[in-house]
């Protein structure tokens, strides 16, 4: 079930969020994106590819950012169900770790792993973009939620390193396994 929060103070117009995960003092805001990716080769139709990336990566990042702004902008941020019943009340002072995650259903690992570095796409630094398939790998790999949260901390920080352009999400995992704080 999606989450909803008001635009302004009225419940007449609501923004939507896919998933909010709470674990201890950590908050993970997730947007899940799917869509038809252009079948045209990038070499012949670059603009079509750029629009596909914008639709999958940039919009998800913007939705995550908008959700965080709402949560941080209200002392008691209320999240509603679609029928406008209160689902949860958030007090952001309870969270010391906040991660934004855009999950794509489409298999775009080569681009998702470095989405924040694609020219022409505006993704909030710190936002982790990955495929649902990579999440399944993480589910099998990480034995402890605390190790996974430490990985998210490092993975989020990696988005801010301009020189780091890995070609696959599992390259990020490999860097973490072999170098820990990469």
Language-model features: where?
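Intrinsically disordered, low-complexity Ser/Thr/Pro/Gly-rich regulatory segments
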Residues: 1-182
